[in-house]
């Protein structure tokens, strides 16, 4: 793998995993525009992608480190019968993780086979943009209402939204932010819950494939560099996004980008052969 391609994929993963624009969709579409085909199951590429997932997860853990310490402490306090907001949120995160975790383990590879056509991925990206626009309307409609605490049923609903991100072109963070807004969270709280909820899923995606990283010792240097670059890009991305939504940033901006990018890619692959 060339150095520029390594840097490109690392930064692309770190940014698009957290921005509501679909990391998997971008990982497939953007290289293809340059005539490159990305096979995430290729033996020479898989260890590198494992490191990218772990880099993203470590960046999220570091950014929310104080929050996670409070959540874990609150969780153990709740086990002792002491009700508290942090414990409630930790239970909500556990419940919200279940749907995507189960479906991902059972169906991820089947879903990927169905959506191997890049034109379908482009259409999914367009739909993702429309959903973000609708989510923005929900966000604005609730802007003057007091924020609500998620019930466990709502947390499950938000977690269920993560399942859609198994389809290339749909964004995990985008779908969960939309669901969080629909459940009554402010834009800032919906973003925070989305990133907290995504951390164990992203971590698990890397850890499940971790043994394959050590089965390719000749690629450890590339994987390590990629993981570090992704962690830096992911950390800067989550810091930007949290400030963006704290300042009443809107999902519609990302929705417009996804719709335009999806339309461009759809038009491109209607008239150009897909790389194999």
Curated annotation (Swiss-Prot):
Q: Matching InterPro entries, A to Z?
A: UppP
Catalytic activity as recorded in UniProt: di-trans,octa-cis-undecaprenyl diphosphate + H2O = di-trans,octa-cis-undecaprenyl phosphate + phosphate + H(+)
> Which residues, if any, are the signal sequence?
none
TM region positions: 1-21, 44-64, 87-107, 114-134, 150-170, 190-210, 222-242, 251-271
Compartments, record wording: Cell inner membrane
Biological process (GO), any one = regulation of cell shape
- Among the Pfam families in the record, one is BacA
Domain of life, source organism: Bacteria
Q: What is its EC number?
A: 3.6.1.27
Q: Name one GO cellular component term.
A: plasma membrane
Q: Name one GO molecular function term.
A: undecaprenyl-diphosphatase activity
The protein's topology relative to the membrane is: Multi-pass membrane protein
Tell me which UniProt keywords the record has, alphabetically. Answer: Antibiotic resistance, Cell inner membrane, Cell membrane, Cell shape, Cell wall biogenesis/degradation, Hydrolase, Membrane, Peptidoglycan synthesis, Transmembrane, Transmembrane helix
Classify the main location: membrane
**What role does this protein play?**
Catalyzes the dephosphorylation of undecaprenyl diphosphate (UPP). Confers resistance to bacitracin.
* Family the UniProt entry places it in: Belongs to the UppP family.
Q: What else is known?
A: Bacitracin is thought to be involved in the inhibition of peptidoglycan synthesis by sequestering undecaprenyl diphosphate, thereby reducing the pool of lipid carrier available.
Name this polypeptide is given: Undecaprenyl-diphosphatase 2
Organism in which the protein naturally occurs: Burkholderia thailandensis (strain ATCC 700388 / DSM 13276 / CCUG 48851 / CIP 106301 / E264)
- Identify the gene encoding this protein: uppP2
């Amino acid at each position: 793998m060339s150095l520029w391609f390594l840097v490109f994929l690392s930064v692309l993963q770190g940014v698009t995993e957290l921005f509501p624009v679909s990391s998997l969709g971008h990982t497939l579409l953007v290289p293809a525009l340059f005539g490159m085909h990305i096979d995430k199951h290729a033996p020479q590429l898989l260890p590198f992608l494992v490191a990218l997932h772990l880099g993203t997860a470590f960046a999220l853990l570091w950014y929310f480190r104080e929050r996670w310490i409070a959540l874990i402490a609150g969780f153990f306090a709740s086990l002792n019968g002491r009700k508290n907001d942090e414990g409630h949120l930790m239970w909500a995160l556990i419940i919200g993780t279940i749907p995507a975790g189960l479906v991902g383990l059972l169906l991820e590879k089947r879903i990927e086979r169905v959506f191997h056509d890049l034109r379908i991925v482009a259409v999914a990206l367009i739909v993702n943009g429309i959903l973000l626009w609708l989510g923005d309307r929900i966000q604005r409609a609730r802007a003057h209402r007091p924020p609500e605490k998620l019930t466990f049923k709502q947390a499950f609903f938000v977690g269920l939204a993560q399942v859609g991100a198994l389809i290339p072109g749909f964004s995990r963070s985008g779908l969960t932010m939309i669901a969080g807004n629909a459940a009554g969270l402010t834009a800032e709280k919906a973003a925070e819950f989305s990133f907290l909820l995504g951390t164990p899923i992203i971590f698990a995606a890397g850890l499940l494939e971790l043994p394959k990283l050590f089965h390719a010792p000749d690629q450890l240097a590339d994987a390590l560099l990629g993981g570090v670059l992704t962690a830096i890009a992911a950390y800067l991305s989550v810091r930007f996004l949290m400030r963006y939504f704290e300042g009443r940033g809107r999902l519609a901006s990302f929705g417009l980008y996804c719709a335009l990018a999806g339309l461009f890619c759809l038009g491109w692959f209607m008239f150009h052969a897909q790389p194999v």
